[in-house]
Every structure is written in structure tokens, then in C-alpha cells.
């Protein structure tokens, strides 16, 4: 049992041997007093003194190397390098027109892959029943209740020609240019009462 009697020094023991907890408590007391002072810092313990910070110890541990799980991982890791090497070797091939004209023989061990089972057949539209109308080109919630592609295209042509003509007439001088007028000279500004 610890018995403290000195009020100036709260960790002074009155009698008996020093308990094992006292040096650590005294260190914590001093650390708290330092932290509450302006500019106070926590002192490094002896275990942290070679690192500078307890967090740095975690950073200095080496990450364990990932084991190679199979022989294919090594081959995959060098795949890009092997592709670049093959392309480079292809560019270095001799540009002999006689060799290029001779077809290369296919080796006997070559494998031809048959993908006919996975080929998608030609799509044919199923004709609509006579009692059904084709779907509308616009949303059902719009005002239009009927729709025709030809009517929409003719309205589009009208709108585009209207937009083109309004752009040409709104440009500076474009209306006069279309009507055959010319730009005014600087001397004509006085005659126009500018």
C-alpha cells in the first residue's frame, strides 16, 4: 500500500519500500505537467528514442513478400515485356519482297479454334400482328398521339431551314449582303446623321 504524506511533492512515500508502480506514475505526472505548460511535449521513452516517434516503428517493418501461387503468375508478370519484344522482332524482320510473296506454312501442331457454336445467327424481325400498331416514336405522355417518321423529318427540315435563315439575318451585315448591299464607307457616316 502506498502512503503519500508530502503535499509539495505528492509522490513522496512516508515509510516502507518504493512500490513498483511509483516510477511509472512519477513519469506520467511529469509528462502531464509538461504537456500543460506552453510549448510542452511528451518526452520520448527509452524504447522510442531510436525511432523519434512510436508511429515510425510500424513504418519500418518490411512488408511480407507475396508468394507466387502458381507458375502462371510469373508468366503473366512478363507478358507485356514479351509482347513488346515480339513487336520489336516483327519490325526487324527482313523486308524481302520474295519472302513476303511466299505463303508461310502452317505448322502441324497449330490449333484452329471453332467458334460456330457461339456465333449469333442473323436477326430477323418478327412481323407484327394485324391488330397491333407499331410503337410510337415519341413518349406516350407527350401531346402527340400519332407519330410518323416522314412527318417528323419534314418538320425537321423546316425547322433547320428556319434556323439557318435566322442565323444568317442576325449576323452583322449578312442581311444587306444577301440583298446585294455593300458595307458603308467611313465618309457615309456623316450623311446618315450618325
UniProtKB/Swiss-Prot annotation:
GO biological process: protein localization
Stretch list, region Disordered: 34-74
Keyword tags: Cytoplasm, Nucleus
Coiled coil: none
Superkingdom of origin organism: Eukaryota
InterPro entries: RNR_inhibitor
Family: Belongs to the DIF1/spd1 family.
Function of the molecule: Mediates the nuclear localization of the ribonucleotide reductase.
Protein name: Damage-regulated import facilitator 1
